[in-house]
Amino acid sequence: MQHASQLQIPATLAEAVRPDTCALIVYDMQVGILRQLPHGGDVLARVLKVVEAARTAGVRIVFMRHMSLPKKLAGVFQTRQMMLWQSKTSPDEVQPWFLRDSPGFALAPELAVREDEAILDKITMSAFEGTPLAIALRDCGLNSFVICGIATEIGIEPTVRHGADLGFIPVLVEDACGAGDQESGARALANMRHMGDAMICSVDELAAAWR
């Protein structure tokens, strides 16, 4: 641990992921998202290892879900986004994929969320925008978060950058994150490495730090 102006500055992975100062954010591991990725099962298996390690270490866990609004409330941005992602040329052709309580909206059942773990819903890419996540972490005295899930280039990178801007130390579990587009995912990882906001580790390295 480094020290500056009476502050403790984590210098190693183990220092950054201390169970009393960090949380685990499991990003959008939903049925309807996992089935869009050819390697979704592999990502889920590695995320489950991260979740189990966090539970064993007593780390606080927050699961994020992406939620669609009904078409009448979707607004300009969400409607345009649906048209792009669904390759439609008219707003009349799109369908909200992740309406609350729809089959695709649900988290993967293997995650088996526990009573002392939170589920937060969002309509944005950053897990911090429009959710109580930052308030909850700060109120628990946490200054870092570990993140894994899907998709690296769509929501995880924005969450890492937003979290860093809010003063948290992001820790990205590289092999427990999946990309919708492999080239874009690799580019997002390269960008995060270049910026240096996040510590980047593997599932095995994280599990060792939590032992």
Q: Model regions: which residues?
A:
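Short acidic, Gly/Ser-rich segments with clustered Asp/Glu that frequently serve as metal-coordination loops
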Residues: 30-35
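Active-site loop/turn elements of alpha/beta-hydrolase fold enzymes
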Residues: 29, 66, 175
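Von Willebrand factor
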Residues: 54-73
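Short Asp/Glu-rich motifs
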Residues: 36, 66, 73-74, 156, ...
